[in-house]
Every structure is written in C-alpha cells, then in structure tokens.
C-alpha cells in the first residue's frame, strides 16, 4: 500500500472515529443521568409553588423573545431553549432554577441538557406557561388549596 493511500485511509478513519467517540461520551452522560434521575423528580406543578416562594427561584422563560415580550411569569429571564447551554454561565447553581416554555416540552429538553451539564438544582414547570396561566398564575397554589374564592 502506498504512503499516500495509507495517509488517506488514516485520515478517513480519524474523521469517522472522532464523531463515534464523541457520541459515545454523550451516550454515557445520558446513561448516568437516567440512572440518577427519579421519575417526575425534575417537574413541578404550578399549584405546588406558593406565591411567596416564586421569588426564591431563578425563573427561565425558554420561549422565543417575541413570546417573552408579549407575556411572561414576573421575574423570569428569557433564555431561549436552544441557548441554555451557551448561556449556562449566567444560570446559578446555588439556588433553585425553574424553567418553562408554552407547554413544557421544549423546557424539558433544555432542562435535560442542563442536567447533563451538571445542573441538579432545576425544575421544569409541568404544563408550561399555558397551564401556569390557566391555574391562576402566581396564585395557583392558593386556588388549588381552595382558599381563593371569587
């Protein structure tokens, strides 16, 4: 086999092997996460958060900037779901983090990525902004307990 052909084959193998190794590392990280997390452990319902507890969360609105500008949970910061890893240095690890989107599906993906990146202090708002709003927003816990009467 000629030296040129051997170099070409070696380069081709390196190109093919690198993504395979990177993918294997990602799979291992996901396996470790799935072994660690408990069912439902990352989700929280709007009615589980008393009004006075909202201020202790770092709240991330994972929707796009136009949806955020139109309406969002008071105190929330806008980090679109695709950008959570790129902007993770602005997300605290020393306080509870709550992440939401419209329904919970995109925020669940963002939350999964953050957990793989080492964030174990976060919760996904089950049902997202739509359910939070439908259940009474910041007053969802009070409504659920039957204390709010209209």
Segment roles from a protein language model:
Residues 2-7, 20-47, 54-57, 65-96, ...:
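Rhodanese-like catalytic fold shared by cysteine-dependent sulfurtransferases
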Residues 9-18:
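Bacterial N-terminal signal peptides
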Residues 60:
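Active-site flanking residues adjacent to catalytic metal/cofactor-binding acidic residues
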Residues 100-101:
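Short, surface-exposed ligand- or partner-binding patches at beta-edge/loop junctions that are enriched
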């Amino acid at each position: 086999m000629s030296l040129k052909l051997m170099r070409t084959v070696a380069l081709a193998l390196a190109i093919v092997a690198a993504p395979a190794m990177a993918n294997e590392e990602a799979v291992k990280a996901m396996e470790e996460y799935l072994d660690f997390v408990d069912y439902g452990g990352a989700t929280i319902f709007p009615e589980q958060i008393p009004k006075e507890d909202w201020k202790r969360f770092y709240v991330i609105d994972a929707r796009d900037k136009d949806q955020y500008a139109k309406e969002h949970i008071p105190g929330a910061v806008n980090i679109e779901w695709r950008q959570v890893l790129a902007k993770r240095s602005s997300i605290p690890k020393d306080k509870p983090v709550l992440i939401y989107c419209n329904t919970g599906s995109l925020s669940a993906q963002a939350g999964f990525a953050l957990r793989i990146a080492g964030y174990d202090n976060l919760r996904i708002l089950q049902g997202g902004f739509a359910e939070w709003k439908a259940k009474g927003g910041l007053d969802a816990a009070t409504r659920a307990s039957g204390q709010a009467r209209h």
